[in-house]
């Protein structure tokens, strides 16, 4: 049975640990000591669905979580909690996204194509179309690090739209480039819409959103404030922006500081309790059973960020074995002799020379 939605997000959060140093990062990873790490929640429980063939716009002020959502959907970064189900191949288009700067334009085309499952023959078939669309001429043979921002954006867009993804994610990619390239991009996006492709369009440009999108999601400091028909949601966002800009600078500053503090103070445990309370109202199961179900759902796609005791033991054994075999290799002795007499590893060079001398004299 075909999925009702192409993209499904349920109770998705994203936490960033603001490490003060690399030492703190290592201590936290290995779960050593009590490291006080400041945290910031870019997403605070977002649930969102995108239908097949739908163009969904994502709007919001800077820092609202728009790009975080697009990166999670595309698989660039993982969510902290919640479920993300994407039914189809995704291709994200942002300024320079996915391009390897030390590779040439041609090499990037091949790499991106292979990563999307295309054969060399299929990549060669679209190569010229990509170069023509990007309009970068002889620079296609130069390293991407030598490109301008506009050239990188054009190449990234051209590659993404020619590898035929099921879901195209466009993150501010139309903000760079001249009017001619912009129109080519719009025409290509409209062509994708006619083909029934799913599009997620992240932008500050409300006119572009109104032109291209069927529905719009309004993100606001990590929360999904509203999702609905394009005109209605964009009108609400415009009114908010107008009213906000009319406030004094002191008010705007205080408001932003307060919202960012809410993101820093977000309590995932309290959020989970809230979900349990809401679900328990409509369930005939016990609250304890509902709590277990909610917890499983929140964390079933999540890998642990810290090492468990078992993992630490495995790592310790692996390190010991690595050091042991390295010393055996340097000493010139067999593994068996090193196990029977480990002291030979303490002075490997001298012992190895003596053994070679004995061998030479015996001849």
From Swiss-Prot:
Residues 247-363 are annotated as: Unknown. Residues 27-246 form the ABC transporter domain. ATP binds at residues 60-67. Its EC number is 7.5.2.4. The keyword DNA-binding does not apply. GO terms for molecular function: ABC-type teichoic acid transporter activity; ATP binding; ATP hydrolysis activity. It is found in: Cell membrane. It catalyses: ATP + H2O + teichoic acidSide 1 = ADP + phosphate + teichoic acidSide 2. Keywords: ATP-binding, Cell membrane, Membrane, Nucleotide-binding, Translocase, Transport. Part of the ABC transporter complex TagGH involved in teichoic acids export. Responsible for energy coupling to the transport system. The complex is composed of two ATP-binding proteins (TagH) and two transmembrane proteins (TagG). Belongs to the ABC transporter superfamily. Teichoic acids exporter (TC 3.A.1.104.1) family. This is Teichoic acids export ATP-binding protein TagH. It comes from Lactiplantibacillus plantarum (strain ATCC BAA-793 / NCIMB 8826 / WCFS1).
